[in-house]
A protein has these predicted regions:
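Transmembrane-helix signature of polytopic, membrane-embedded enzymes
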Residues: 24, 116-135
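Alpha-helical transmembrane segments and terminal signal-anchor/GPI-anchor hydrophobic tails
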Residues: 53-56, 63, 86, 191-304, ...
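Short hydrophobic/aromatic helix or loop-helix immediately within or flanking a transmembrane segment
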Residues: 53-61, 68, 73-97
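Transmembrane-helix motifs of polytopic, lipid-linked glycan transferases
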Residues: 105-121
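Membrane-embedded helix bundles of polyisoprenyl
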Residues: 127-145, 149-156, 183
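Membrane-interface alpha helices of multi-pass inner-membrane proteins
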Residues: 138, 169-193, 294
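Membrane-water interface signatures at transmembrane helix termini and the short loops
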Residues: 143-150, 155, 180, 268-325
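Membrane-interface transmembrane helices that cradle and orient dolichyl/undecaprenyl
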Residues: 155-169
């Protein structure tokens, strides 16, 4: 487990260079960090991460490409897997022996490089964003929930097109994201929200009302299951039935959600003061992440999927506190402390990773 902590120390050290490096040097640091993380995630063995063995099973269940194209619609619907995974797995299976390693490495390249590119494009504090990405997102989405990890990369890259009102590029990237993970479909609503101003009262209610409904045990998922949304309805019904069988409980005030509530509240009050043109839309996405968590809490898998999908904007949002908190050193310390809390939450509380090892 020591290697995880050494990596965290490395990225904290890198973040301390935020004000000391030129933009070109920062771009080089981001590139090298991306390569390091791709190798770290892509070369891991099946003993690292809770989902690796699940992906081995899914990979073995996928038909070869010749069979897949015979009845594509039936295959997608019956498998309940996204088309991208079916296509990639079937292609790799047809061309590589022990192809699961190739598949995992490919997802690492895609998921990590897309997020590094998004940091380069969106963040004003790139090295601090890199630290938040490593401690709060990398382990969960690029070493565990890898399909969602790639989808998130495309969604983050779509955010500039919300500001530009470029619907073609936004919905093109959204479509690709959905092909990697169906939960990404919910991101489409953010194209239509006001990205210049934030109504503080409305967004406070967006945070508070779902919490009240959750405490009153209103089952929003059961209501949605009464409507027909194609394969999305199938997913919701499957998760709802699974919840009834498993009787699993959800901690509605877990660390990640509480932190996002605090961050969202801070930026509801301060987003318009930020110099960053993405601050308002990032704040709204963060607020909806909390709202969906509580609205969908009757089906924990869906609640966490949507929350984790939308909470990835914290990569950009948390470092923006540097613009708003004085003196600046306190804000930088705040970002590092938050990253430490994220990291320890992944390592000690979630406990989904064993000691690191490679497959060779």
């Amino acid at each position: 487990m020591l290697v995880y902590y050494l990596l965290f120390v490395l990225f904290v050290t890198i973040s301390l260079l935020e004000d000391r490096l030129t933009p070109k040097a920062k771009a080089q640091v981001l590139f090298l960090s991306g390569v390091l993380l791709i190798m770290f995630a892509g070369l891991r063995s099946n003993k690292v991460g809770a989902d690796y063995k699940t992906y081995e099973i899914l990979y073995q269940s996928v038909q070869r490409s010749s069979d897949l194209f015979t009845h594509p619609l039936h295959t997608v619907v019956s498998s309940r897997l996204e088309p991208s995974f079916l296509l990639l797995a079937s292609f790799i299976k047809a061309h590589f022996n022990d192809g699961i390693k190739v598949l995992i490495f490919f997802y690492a390249i895609m998921g990590i490089s897309l997020k590094i590119k998004a940091i380069q494009k969106i963040s004003d504090y790139k090295l601090l964003s890199l630290l938040i990405y490593f401690s709060g997102v990398f382990f969960l989405h690029d070493m565990n929930q890898i399909r969602a990890g790639v989808a998130i990369g495309f969604l983050l890259l779509s955010i500039p097109y919300i500001i530009e009102k470029n619907y073609k590029m936004f919905f093109f990237l959204l479509l690709i994201a959905v092909l990697f993970h169906y939960s990404a479909i919910i991101f489409g609503l953010f194209f239509f929200v006001n990205n210049k101003k934030i109504n503080q009262t409305v967004y406070l209610l967006i945070l508070v009302i779902p919490i009240i409904l959750c405490l009153l045990k209103l089952d929003v998922i059961s209501l949605l299951c009464k409507f027909e949304f194609g394969i999305f309805s199938e997913k919701m019904r499957a998760y709802s039935e699974l919840q009834k069988i498993a009787h699993s409980k959800i901690n509605i005030f877990n660390f990640g959600v509480l932190l996002q509530i605090i961050v969202s509240l801070f930026f509801i009050m301060n987003a318009e003061k930020s110099k960053n043109k993405y601050a308002v839309i990032l704040t709204k996405i963060s607020c909806f992440g909390v709202a969906f968590f509580y609205l969908f809490s009757s089906a924990p898998v869906i609640a966490f999927r949507e929350f984790e999908l939308l909470s990835c904007v914290q990569i950009f949002l948390i470092p923006l506190s540097i613009d708003l908190v004085k003196p600046k050193v306190f804000a930088q310390l705040f970002v590092i402390v938050i990253s430490l809390a994220y990291f320890l939450n992944q390592m000690l509380i979630n406990s989904i990773f064993g000691p690191y090892s490679t497959f060779f």
